[in-house]
A protein has these predicted regions:
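Hydrophobic h-region of N-terminal signal peptides that target proteins for export
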Residues: 15-26
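Aromatic- and Gly/Pro-enriched helix-to-coil junctions and flexible linker segments
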Residues: 25-222, 247, 251-254, 258-263, ...
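Sequence context surrounding c-type heme c attachment/ligation sites in exported
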Residues: 28-79, 86-88, 93-97, 421, ...
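Structural motif
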Residues: 231-236, 269-279, 302-312, 352-360, ...
Length: 648
């Protein structure tokens, strides 16, 4: 870790600006170069199509006006440099850049953005609980779920039962691509009303006659059989507040805080005491200290500091469980033991054994790989259940069973039920068969862990039926592989792409042959030379993900990567992916996992951490658990930088 702390300074830059005094910092020099040299080029030649009213390819240069802005978009500049040097941008109908301007852009990119820099944690930012985090936090706080009626749940393909997720608006993905990246999503008055409704619903259920066990746990006492909530005593109310408050705040609370909450309850009895108790509990649940993460940590304006153990417990629990810290984490935070590296490793191991760790696959995995797209694509509930749950169970297996990271691509273990059994050829005979009730055509059947033997065309996430169904054509499949698995940045395609022309009269061209003609445009070819070999490698699978068995009629699935590596079919491509492309796949896995864990878009200052973790995982054929341990012990996870002026 010490190597991550060594400082690497920017080189002086494109030009030596003679009027600068020699004592000016490299950082100031870099800022002057961008603002005085590169920014005018962007404004003159790029902003017309990539800024203000028109934003092509999701690239907005109007928001990049300083070196700091440029640093925050570090992934963008490789593509920008590529298209400029290949004469693909500016487009033909715009004045081209001069040779001198191209040299300036290239030199600036190489010297300013490729120079190693110091590893730093992210800026301290409180984050609102996402919808799933809020639901899980309520559940672990009270011991029960708030659910909608069964009839309402059955109206959706997902069968969503959670009242929380039904009522709260869906969180949009943040800049990181994940919905837990909520810093820029404030709480509106309408959403606050919904939180109030949910708080009332939870409290009414807590004090209902059927919830005695949860109430007894909070009171820390056994209640008489004929006890009624209106008969609550002062001692019982105090026990509830003392138990509830630190669990809701996610850190142990001082006696002063507890006494202030208890003051309005004193001298009250019976129904009045119950009403006052509910009011105080609701106030806690509507407090920013409950709805946001990180508000209670001590602040040190202008400093880089380790986060306290309670913040570390929150980061750990919402990363691995999407839920509040349990009693074990709270106790370790209180004793100051949690920040020790060996303790964190032990807790990762413990937490991955908990059923709560399924959230890593259901939330992180689904968002990373775009699996939720199946919700819109497959409307039939039985098929949806099979195609969507199979990759989730596979990811859960990788994450929780200490499996190598690269098994994401190649694994003999899968999960099957009758809904996907038909995709596995002769291996189907070894699968468990479930009898269905008479009169019912199809029904959901349970999944089982299964070892592949003869279905060699399966194995790993890429060839799962749901993934192939979700990406039905070679361009979709190639784009998904590049973006989600290899982590290659691709701009959005132009809006005015002409349709693929049919075969000329007298020629029976395949789709691939017709597409070769279609993509002859130079600006398209740059991306398609990366996309097409990967996408067409999967042409032996039809639009539903079924493997084509007729060897005499198989389409051409061969290809050549930009690296020069050739393959005849996906089986050969898979071998390339797990060997020469392994580091790239591991690096993207590290990048996506760290971004999810930190609930933010990564910056240039995270790259040394990604480099180090990737190196360790590749060298040791590391597992997903190794990756998680590396992340929770990393600089970005354990530390933060406080701004000079802190809001809130």
């Amino acid at each position: 870790m010490e190597t991550l702390r060594k400082k690497h300074f920017f080189k002086s830059g494109l030009f030596t600006v003679l009027i600068l005094v020699h004592t000016a910092s490299d950082r100031l020099n870099a800022r002057v170069q961008f603002e005085e040299t590169i920014l005018p080029i962007l404004q003159a030649s790029c902003i017309k199509c990539h800024g203000k009213e028109k934003i092509k390819g999701e690239v907005d240069f109007s928001k990049i006006t300083t070196q700091v802005d440029a640093d925050s978009q570090f992934e963008l500049w490789e593509t920008v440099t590529e298209v400029i040097m290949a004469n693909e941008m500016p487009p033909e109908d715009n004045p081209p850049l001069s040779a001198e301007e191209k040299k300036l852009v290239l030199k600036w990119y190489e010297e300013q953005l490729k120079t190693p820099i110091e590893a730093k944690p992210g800026i301290y930012k409180p984050r609102r609980l996402s919808g799933p985090e809020y639901r899980n936090t309520l559940r672990s706080l009270f011991g029960f779920d708030l659910e909608v009626a069964i009839a309402q749940a059955q109206q959706t393909v997902t069968g969503e039962k959670s009242l929380v997720l039904k009522l709260l608006p869906k969180d949009p993905p943040g800049e990181s691509g994940f919905i837990n990246d909520t810093n820029s999503s404030p709480i509106s008055p309408v959403i606050l009303e919904q939180y109030a409704f949910l708080a009332n619903a939870a409290l009414e259920k807590l004090f209902a006659p059927k919830q005695r066990s949860e109430l007894e746990a909070m009171m820390q006492t056994k209640l008489p059989d004929n006890w009624k909530p209106n008969e609550i005593t002062q001692d019982q109310a105090q026990s509830i507040i003392k138990k509830f408050t630190p669990r809701a705040m996610r850190r142990h609370t001082s006696d002063v805080t507890i006494n202030n909450i208890l003051k309005p309850l004193k001298e009250k009895t019976g129904p009045e005491l119950l009403k006052a108790l509910k009011f105080e509990m609701k106030a806690i649940m509507l407090s920013p200290k409950f709805l946001y993460r990180g508000l209670l940590m001590e602040k040190f304006p202008g400093q880089q500091r380790p986060v306290d153990d309670y913040e570390l417990a929150e980061r750990l629990s919402y990363f691995l469980w999407e839920d509040r810290p349990d009693e074990k984490l709270m106790d370790l935070a209180m004793t100051g033991e949690l920040h020790k590296k060996e303790t964190l490793k032990e807790q990762v191991d413990r937490m991955l054994k908990s059923p709560k760790s399924i959230s890593l696959a259901e939330s992180f995995g689904v968002q990373w790989l775009g699996i939720a797209n199946l919700d819109e694509l497959i409307k039939e509930p039985i098929s949806h259940h099979s195609l969507r749950h199979q990759p989730v169970l596979f990811l859960n297996h990788l994450f929780t069973q200490d499996r190598p990271v690269i098994e994401l691509i190649s694994s003999k273990t899968t999960f099957v039920n009758q809904g996907v059994s038909g995709f596995y050829g002769q291996d189907r005979g070894r699968m468990t068969r479930f009898s269905k009730p008479k009169g019912i055509e199809r029904t959901k059947t349970p999944f089982e862990e299964f070892t592949l033997e003869k279905a060699t065309w399966r194995g790993g996430i890429i060839t799962m039926p749901g993934i192939l169904t979700m990406n039905r054509g070679p361009i979709q499949r190639g784009t998904w592989l590049l973006r989600r698995i290899l982590g290659v940045r691709l701009g959005e395609p132009p809006a005015d792409i002409p349709p693929i022309k049919p075969s000329p009269r007298g020629q029976n061209l395949t789709f691939r042959e017709r597409f070769e003609r279609h993509r002859s445009d130079a600006s398209c070819a740059r991306c398609h030379e990366k996309i097409d070999p990967l996408g067409f490698s999967l042409d032996h699978y039809d639009v539903k993900g079924q493997f084509l068995q007729n060897k005499d009629a198989l389409p051409d699935a061969s290809g050549k990567l930009p690296t020069g590596e050739s393959f005849k079919n996906y089986a050969e491509l898979k071998e390339i992916l797990v060997t020469s492309q392994k580091e790239k796949i591991v690096r993207n896995s590290v990048d996506r996992t760290l971004s999810y864990a930190m609930c933010r878009k990564l910056t240039r200052h995270d790259q040394p951490t990604i480099d180090l973790i990737t190196k360790n995982i590749v060298k040791d054929n590391g597992t997903w658990k190794d990756l998680f341990v590396e992340i929770v012990n990393s600089l970005p996870f354990r530390e933060t930088i406080f701004a000079e002026k802190i809001k809130g």
